[in-house]
């Protein structure tokens, strides 16, 4: 089926893990409310099941669920979704910088752009 072959991310990852896995190791981070308004949490459960089964390489990322949280939950367990939605930059820029520092080439400039 066309949709599955081209848009079902879990299916595509499972089908192509030998090729995609090494490129995505440590890069997959999924946050989902367990009461998603569109029931997307059900798809996330299936994705997590696949990711946890990966080997060579293991996906080495994270899947996190917000208890009673709705759509757009972003991983903040300390605040209600209506407030945490206002904090995307606060939360994810730090994670992006940590990833850049960890994976940057040895001669990369990691200081001049930080202020």
Model-identified regions with their sequence ranges:
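Mobile cap/lid helix-loop segments that gate and shape the active-site cleft of serine hydrolases
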Residues: 1-21
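Short, well-structured alpha-helical interface segments that form or flank functional binding sites
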Residues: 4, 8, 25, 42, ...
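Extracellular/periplasmic catalytic domains that process cell-envelope and extracellular macromolecules
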Residues: 21-24, 57
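C-terminal catalytic histidine-bearing segment of alpha/beta-hydrolase fold enzymes
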Residues: 29-115
